[in-house]
């Protein structure tokens, strides 16, 4: 497997830390050892997150093509668009962001705080669109690309989550390689890796990266899209493509893609009671914040799997904390009492 043949523009500090979640582990019985890999601490650009790791492999292409404007898309509280805006500012590029109404939630400040507020401060051209949530290419995004061209600019297209992009899976192949280096230092290997999945390329990259040492099926995706069939298809397709790109040496099949569908409801962006319990429990036991859209749902999934005895006793489980905390501000009413 050869990731090094792809150019990479450094946007992160380096390997992200792995933190023991000892108090949470003990609270859940102490039979499973939980750790977090802190992708939420990976960069100094507007709080970073998993998309920043992915963008390291997209940006060289944007620069090589002479593009002057990054154009991306997400929901109103999209972490993706905030990270794209930050990277564009760092590079001295323009940025156009399509922010669709992906979440069936209303709060007086939802479209004025958190991620979207940061994107505006970073200088992005933020365009609100009423369209609802779906996975795949969006007309509003294609219209934004065309508007840049019509104005004489040269856009670089970054789809939702960086996912449906030829280079979108590479960053998290690198994540797996990084984990292996850290495991050598720690003196043990993780038995399972838990990660949130929606647009798919984060888990897809992990599946390919961990397939290199036989652990593809130990990557447990927690669906947060509430459209798991679409998410599963996208993970599998991106993983197959990424495996070919990096020369994995074997095909990725549906057996390699594990996606737990139990924790994503009631719909994308709306927390359930378990999500909220997990957010508060992790915060109060570990001082680690998660969000209602993504990480709260994957944290809920991991907690319930421990409670249900789904991890064998003595397992070491690595939780991939992908970021997303700025979105908490958009849910201020839900958390008005903590």
Swiss-Prot record:
Annotated protein name in UniProt: 1-aminocyclopropane-1-carboxylate deaminase
Top-level division of the source organism's lineage: Bacteria
Quaternary structure annotation from Swiss-Prot or TrEMBL: Homotrimer.
Name of the encoding gene: acdS
Similarity section: Belongs to the ACC deaminase/D-cysteine desulfhydrase family.
Keyword Hydrolase: yes
Modification sites for N6-(pyridoxal phosphate)lysine: 51
A Pfam match: PALP
SUPFAM superfamilies (UniProt xref): Tryptophan synthase beta subunit-like PLP-dependent enzymes
GO biological process: 1-aminocyclopropane-1-carboxylate metabolic process; amine catabolic process
Keywords annotated in UniProt: Hydrolase, Pyridoxal phosphate
InterPro entries listed in its UniProt record: ACCD_DCysDesulf, ACP_carboxylate_deaminase, ACP_carboxylate_deaminase_bac, TrpB-like_PALP, TrpB-like_PALP_sf
CC cofactor: pyridoxal 5'-phosphate
Organism encoding this protein: Paraburkholderia phytofirmans (strain DSM 17436 / LMG 22146 / PsJN)
Described function: Catalyzes a cyclopropane ring-opening reaction, the irreversible conversion of 1-aminocyclopropane-1-carboxylate (ACC) to ammonia and alpha-ketobutyrate. Allows growth on ACC as a nitrogen source.
GO molecular function per UniProt: 1-aminocyclopropane-1-carboxylate deaminase activity; D-cysteine desulfhydrase activity; pyridoxal phosphate binding
């Amino acid at each position: 497997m050869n990731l090094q043949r792809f150019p990479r523009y450094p946007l992160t500090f380096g390997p992200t830390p792995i933190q023991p979640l000892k108090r949470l582990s003990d609270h859940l019985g102490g039979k499973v050892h939980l750790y977090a890999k802190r992708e939420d601490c990976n960069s100094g650009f507007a709080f970073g997150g998993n998309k920043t790791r992915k963008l390291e492999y997209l940006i060289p292409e944007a620069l090589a093509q002479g593009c002057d404007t990054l154009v991306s898309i997400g929901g109103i509280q999209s972490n993706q668009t905030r990270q794209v805006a930050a990277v564009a500012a760092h590079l001295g590029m323009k940025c156009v962001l399509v922010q669709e109404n992906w979440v069936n939630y209303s709060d007086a400040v939802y479209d004025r705080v958190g991620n979207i507020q940061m994107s505006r401060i970073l200088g992005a051209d933020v365009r609100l669109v009423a369209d609802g949530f779906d996975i795949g290419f969006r007309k509003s995004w294609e219209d934004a690309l065309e508007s840049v061209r019509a104005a004489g600019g040269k856009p670089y297209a970054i789809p939702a989550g960086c996912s449906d992009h030829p280079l979108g899976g590479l960053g998290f192949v690198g994540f797996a390689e990084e984990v292996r280096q850290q495991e050598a230092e720690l003196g043990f290997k993780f038995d399972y890796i838990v990660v949130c999945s929606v647009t798919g390329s984060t888990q897809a990259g992990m599946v390919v990266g961990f397939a290199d040492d036989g652990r593809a099926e130990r990557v447990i995706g927690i669906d947060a899209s509430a459209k798991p069939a679409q998410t599963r298809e996208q993970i599998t397709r991106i993983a197959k493509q990424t495996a070919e790109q990096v020369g994995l040496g074997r095909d990725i099949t549906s057996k390699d893609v594990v996606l737990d569908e139990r924790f994503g409801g009631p719909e994308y962006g709306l927390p359930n009671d378990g999500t909220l319990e997990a957010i508060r429990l992790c915060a109060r036991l570990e001082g680690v914040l998660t969000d209602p859209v993504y990480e709260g749902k994957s944290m809920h999934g991991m907690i319930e799997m421990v409670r249900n005895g789904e991890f064998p006793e003595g397992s070491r489980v690595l939780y991939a904390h992908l970021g997303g905390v700025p979105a908490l501000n958009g849910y201020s009413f839900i958390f008005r009492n903590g």
